[in-house]
Amino acid sequence: MNEKNLKPASVFYYFEEICQVPRPSKREEKIIAYLKAFGREHDLETKTDEVGNVLIKKPATPGKENLKTVILQSHIDMVCEKNSDVEHDFLIDPIETVVDGEWLKAKGTTLGADNGIGVATELAILAATDIEHGPLECLFTVDEETGLTGAFALKPGFMTGDILINLDSEDEGELFIGCAGGANTTAEFTYQPVSAPQDYFYFRVAVKGLTGGHSGDDINKGRANANKLLNRFLTQLASKYILYLCEIDGGNLHNAIPREAQALCAVPMKDKESVRVDLNIYTAELENEYAATEPNLRTELSSESPCKEAIDMTTAGHLLRAVYAVHNGVYAMSQDIPGLVETSSNLASIKQVEGNKIKIVTSQRSSILSSRKDMSEMIRSAFLLGGAEVTTGEGYPGWKPNTDSPVLKVAVDSYKKLFGVEPKVKAIHAGLECGLFLEKYPSLDMVSFGPTLRGVHSPDERMLIPTVDKFWRHLLDVLVNIPTK
């Protein structure tokens, strides 16, 4: 990265270093080895726990020994996505970076700035001999992206710091002081396959072209849920015609708003044209309802060959009604922070699985644990009434905003002093590891900030280079102004 002459040089040096080290989620052994070697090379106390979290300690610089101990924290795994025309093995190949104007990108893959830039920043501070700071502990956690494994496994006593600064935020100039907790509620309907009539009109109906997005960050933007839209139409058909449901499929990831859903159905041949008319009317209704948020919404209906088997009508009816009943979207807004979603649920996916089962995954989020549990129980109740087997996962805790946080005041004052403007203080309706840290270390004072990233979790991931220097200057000034013990 040196040949690119990016500033701050030390941060980009280490970012390029770790871009050479493969680090997919759940396969972080190479980056763990790199961090342990780094600790030895710099003669710093280094330890790991049973899941691979790494903690590197650095003593205070002279005159700063009386400051409270600060934990700097980043996760070491990255989301591994590539364009279909790119040859790349994330287990062995380095990430190739390229400068595009003011942005740093990768060549057809995720960049890994989420959260590699946080890791690089910590390494630059650990390696520096000209930066003032109090006692430091640098925590590097594993598998944030696919299970929060490192944060879940963290044991009390592994760290000793008083203040934790999470470096996993993506908007420079914004300070985060809260996040949602979450859990998945999964329902399974077991059906009896029945013989499908051969003299019916078979058709595949699909909802496509939706915007989708993150089920936390984007849940308040009025976007449509493909599973909900498809189910609504199927329920209409079932109330008017003899409807056989043969297949149903929608959505994929628990943390994504589903963009597409489809079903294979059959109605008596005499109702063939009526179904087409119904879909045209329904599509016009949706285009009116979602004119502002879903400009590319479309429906499709295509004739299909007859199926041999269908879902029994009783189960199909219970399924459609239960999916219709479950809440989807924002449920409550925060009473503390204007504009922040407090509680929501996402009808994430509907899949047919082995054993004649239909599996439905929903995801609940809230910054208040009792509200999240209430939302999960609401979803559970609707599915139980429909005859499904329902389970709610253990979940992860939220981080309730503390507007009186001492480290927040330091960070706000520092930003105003350095840049002449007030930073935005926010919470997010998505998960951060901070909620789990607070569960294990209840007295921690926490804040999260970082440089500007866009397109994370996709090959379009990019980092705004000038914001890295601002982030760096801000972090170093915060470290100098940490309160005394």
Regions found by a protein language model. Give the residues of each.
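Substrate-recognition/cap regions that form aromatic- and gly/pro-loop-enriched pockets
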Residues: 340-430
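His/Asp/Glu-rich mid-to-C-terminal helical/loop segments that flank catalytic regions of hydrolases
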Residues: 222-240, 270-272, 317-324, 332-335, ...
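Acidic, glycine-rich active-site loops and adjacent beta-strand->loop/helix elements
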Residues: 76-78, 139-147, 169-172, 211, ...
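Zn-dependent metallopeptidase/amidohydrolase metal-coordination segment
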Residues: 7-11, 335, 342-355, 363, ...
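Active-site metal-coordination/substrate-binding segment of hydrolases
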Residues: 64-146, 151-162, 184, 313-316, ...
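Midchain, well-structured core segments that form catalytic/ion-binding scaffolds
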Residues: 22, 102-105, 145-146, 152-365
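Acidic/His- and Gly-rich active-site-bordering loop/insert found
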Residues: 2-103
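Active-site-adjacent substrate-binding region
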Residues: 218, 225-227, 232-248, 393, ...
